Amino acid sequence: MALTQTRKQEIINQYQAHGTDTGSADLQVALLTERINQLTTHLQANPKDHASRRGLLQLIGRRRGLLSYIQKKDFQRYQDLIGRLGIRR
C-alpha cells in the first residue's frame, strides 16, 4: 500500500517549492492525496477491510487540516493546489 520510492520522488519533484523542499504543506497534501487514492482503490476491491478504511479516514483528516492551513495562509495557492490535484472541496 505504501508509495514506491520512485513515485514518491516524482511527486516531490512536481510539487516542491524549491530544490531542497521535502516537507512543505503543498507537498504533504500531494503525497497524502496519492496515498488516499491508492487506499480508495484498495477499499473498492476489499470492502470489508475496516482497518484500512480507518486509516483512510485518518489520512483524509490530516489532509483536510493541511488544506485548511494553506487556505488561511494563501487562498490563491490553495485554489491552484486543489485544481492541480483534482480535489473537490
Curated annotation (Swiss-Prot):
PROSITE patterns: RIBOSOMAL_S15
Signal peptide residue numbers: none
A Pfam family of this chain: Ribosomal_S15
Membrane-spanning residues: none
SMART domains: Ribosomal_S15 (SM01387)
Coiled coil regions in record: none
Superkingdom of the source species: Bacteria
InterPro entries in alphabetical order: Ribosomal_uS15, Ribosomal_uS15_bac-type, uS15_NS1_RNA-bd_sf
CC annotations in GO: cytosolic small ribosomal subunit
Annotated GO MF terms: rRNA binding; structural constituent of ribosome
GO annotation, biological process: translation
Keyword Ribonucleoprotein: yes
Keywords: Ribonucleoprotein, Ribosomal protein, RNA-binding, rRNA-binding
Family as reported in the entry's similarity comment: Belongs to the universal ribosomal protein uS15 family.
Purpose: One of the primary rRNA binding proteins, it binds directly to 16S rRNA where it helps nucleate assembly of the platform of the 30S subunit by binding and bridging several RNA helices of the 16S rRNA.
Subunit structure and binding partners: Part of the 30S ribosomal subunit. Forms a bridge to the 50S subunit in the 70S ribosome, contacting the 23S rRNA.
Protein name, per record: Small ribosomal subunit protein uS15
Species annotation: Gloeothece citriformis (strain PCC 7424) (Cyanothece sp. (strain PCC 7424))
Gene that produces this protein: rpsO
